[in-house]
Amino acid sequence: MGDTHSAAGKNHEYATLSQGASDGKILFTWASGNLLILIGDIEVLLVYEFLMHKDEERVIELEFLRATENAALHSSHWMGRGDKEAADFAACDAIRGMFDLMDIRGEIVIGEGIKDEAPGLFIGEKVGTWAEGSPRFDVALDPVDGTTNVSKGMPNSISCIAAAIPEDGEDCALQEIPAFYMNKLSYPEVVRQAWIKDPSLPISVDAPISEVIKVSAKLLGKNVRDITVMVLDRPRNEYIIEQVRSLGSKLRMIADGDITAAMAPSLPSTDVDLYAGIGGAPEAVLSAAGLRCLGGGQQAKIWPADEAEKQQLIKDGWGDQLDRIYRSKDLAAGNNILFCATGISASPLLQGVHIDGKTAVTHSVLMRIKSKTVRFVEAHHDLRTKTIRLRSTKEETRM
């Protein structure tokens, strides 16, 4: 190893930054025993700006990332064991445990559970220490997006959080949608910019997917047969599947996990061009937050599962919103939003948890709307010293 330098400020005396002698690797060692590997000049090194600055969003962002890391690690023990509820509980327990240590005044605005019905983190739940003077955050999260995938040992599962500091005059930056499902369409930045310039283009969740594919192919410089559409494999999406196949385009069907699927068309490392179909409404808000940071577009429209849900939405005052097309900015408003996720099993966005002897490796992404910086973080956790604080035990628990 080369020289070791202190990266700690007056109030941060727990970190050291070491410059490796080979391959341009930079090693950042935490007193907790975790090892974070940053390769070359990848911009993820800027994660450590929080050591030098007072920006509240920047200071706390790594703590949110640690929450998804812990959730991914703890739920990964249930990979392929056929118990998705246990995997979900493990992730929730780890996230709650991390939130208990965070000096924020947080409130869950998009969750997955109902109050008093574990394991989900319910809407309205207060998280953080709520210490005087601590920053307020609205929190949207999915402790495990892809619980079925985890239970079956399949790919495409992540733990993710979107957090926002509401801007002046805003009650909430992350829009709660009271429906179970939304019909969604997501596409890369090139397509989004083209639609902004010419709104008459048939780039709409209301348009036939065949028309969306044709115009997207022109904009992306591809043949229609080379356009890849990702679709959640559900009977309710059969009409989309049939259109894609009839047109001769490529189809990639997934069993679960439509947050990463909605973001896939905007990721440079995937060959997915479009995501279309009916998926979860809470997931639409999380993917909107991610796409606001990453670039790319999403449209979503409330999709009542049956007449009873439709009538309930009308009764609750949402009748005039049933035909509304929500864009990313409608679901994730303002510029004080961060998005982080950690892979549980491999997905288009992230690699999954890998345990090799005494080391667990996690892959995460951390993004902010304000800076538009996308940071990919590979963390090596020494299992001889690694602990996860769990809400259920209120203690640090060995992996």
Where is each model-derived feature located?
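Flexible, acidic active-site loops/lids enriched in D/E/S/T/G that coordinate Mg2+ and/or position polar
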Residues: 29, 88-169, 175
